[in-house]
From Swiss-Prot:
GO CC annotation terms, alphabetical: nucleus; transcription repressor complex
Disruption phenotype: Mutant are aconidial, female sterile, have reduced growth rates and form hyphae that coil in a counterclockwise direction, opposite to that of the wild-type.
GO biological process: conidium formation; DNA damage response; hyperosmotic response; mitotic cell cycle; negative regulation of dipeptide transport; negative regulation of transcription by RNA polymerase II; positive regulation of transcription by RNA polymerase II; regulation of fatty acid biosynthetic process
Record's protein name: Transcriptional repressor rco-1
Regions of compositional bias (Pro residues) in chain numbering: 144-163
InterPro entries assigned: G-protein_beta_WD-40_rep (IPR020472), Tscrpt_rep_Tup1_N (IPR013890), WD40/YVTN_repeat-like_dom_sf (IPR015943), WD40_repeat_CS (IPR019775), WD40_repeat_dom_sf (IPR036322), WD40_rpt (IPR001680)
Native organism taxonomy: Eukaryota, Fungi, Dikarya, Ascomycota, Pezizomycotina
Amino acid sequence: MSMYPHRPIAGAPIQNMGRLNELLDGIRMEFESQARQYETCQHDLATQLQELQVIREKVFQMEQHQMNVKQKYEDEIALLRRQLEARGGAPGNMNPPPQHPGQQQPPAIGLGSNVFSAIMAGQGGQALVPPPPPPQQQEQPAHMPAPPGLQGPPPPPPPPSQQPPFQQQYQGPQGPGNFPPQPPQSTASPGPAGKRGIGRPPAGGPATPQINTPIPYNGGPAQSPQVPTHPTPDHTRMAQHHQPPPPPPSQTNALSELDPDRLPNHIKKMKDDWWVIFNAAVPRVLDVELVHTLQHESVVCCVRFSMDGKYVATGCNRSAQIYDVETGEKLCILQDENIDLTGDLYIRSVCFSPDGKYLATGAEDKLIRVWDIQSRTIRNTFHGHEQDIYSLDFSRDGRTIASGSGDRTVRLWDIETGQNTSVLSIEDGVTTVAISPDKQFVAAGSLDKSVRVWDMRGYLAERLEGPDGHKDSVYSVAFSPDGRNLVSGSLDKTIKMWELSAPRGIPSSAPPKGGRCIKTFEGHRDFVLSVALTPDSQWVLSGSKDRGVQFWDPRTGHTQLMLQGHKNSVISVAPSPVTGPNGVGYFATGSGDMRARIWSYSRI
């Protein structure tokens, strides 16, 4: 033990405090340096965002300029073609190459083209697809097949040498001895159109679409009677006359290829102006009856039932109309009186709100109008699309409307606030939209042959395409009632059913994994323009440019029946969400023949 007390060194605390101050000064300087770097980064980021916005604006201006220039040229070309057609044809050096069915290219939507033009321009000009007339009424040379004949025998045309070249190749069905094996099909699809001018002839084809009548199936004779020059053909025709009709072809879905005149009575149903062919290869379990015919003054572009199944709405030129399903009575006409009275303004899409109080309409003027049905006044007008609106759908809660347009966007609108809540952009025109029953997803079909599914936050969850996907533009999509599957119809003449199996709602930098195509329904002879599922998911319905409506079994892929009940393309088909007494269901069709029809279907 030391005898001297311990004392601290006097200078130690001062040295420690100095060291602490140095460290604090270093931290402060580092913080200030980081703060300056942050401010510099923020400034650089703001500058880059501003530059990016300038680039976007310039690109948008360039796109608008390009679209305006393209529209101007298309308008000038259309005007010149109309002038040439009004004068009786085009000069020989402007004669376009003949179009073959396998080479049809539908025009693009949204940048000034008119996909509906072929139908709109031919209002009332087409006759119903009747059973082909008896052979003795169509005497043809031995090497030519019977003409399809849309309205009976046409007047004999002048000799080919006296016809302008354009008419020689592009006129409709010609008289005996001067018609091609099949009439040329219009390259303009009767689906959603481009900009205005629906009532005018399309730029690239005849004013009225030449849609073929049913082609006799393979077992039937392919030519009309003629004066025999050799005993063998005469003997063959006599044998065919006494033989019973040959059986249907082996393709179980080729109902549109069958000649109803040559079918036995138990697989067909013939009425005054409509008929049904049943698939003989599968058990017959359905029957169809006409309930009401709703005559319009223009092409019927769309049909839609209310959620309670009591009303059906139609969209036509300048107005939407609502009918009572039970009586067929027209209850009201919804027409905006403030629009220009000149020209056409086709209503491309209609959709009831779930409570039935409102009807949303989309039209060529790029506006969405939400009508209060009871007061017949406009509740909301949504602006924002830059091209025609082709499709609308209400969410099941009645709060959100989805719209698809040729401007390559899907937009979501809040009906309560009147705001555009989301813009989903793609590479090509949007032809059709649908919101899933659970209100979580929105699907859209496009001219780029694919179907996209987003969640309501805007994340792309599915892209349905690939080797099993469509080979041409998709014109219609519909969710199954349980939301697990989706059906799509295309200009490739097929319907596809997709299983929506990919994970959804999870943002990812990787390309979204598409769902799986589980069925492809083949059997239509022309573009598929509209698809839907019955409320019990038992049947897929499709409407086509071939004028037919087909019922498909989603489990087997076989068609149950084909209904022919219109004189022109079936542009829209919609089932009622409600099944009536005794399991009777209803569906509506809208057509280029200026009629909508309500039908019933029931099990037998």
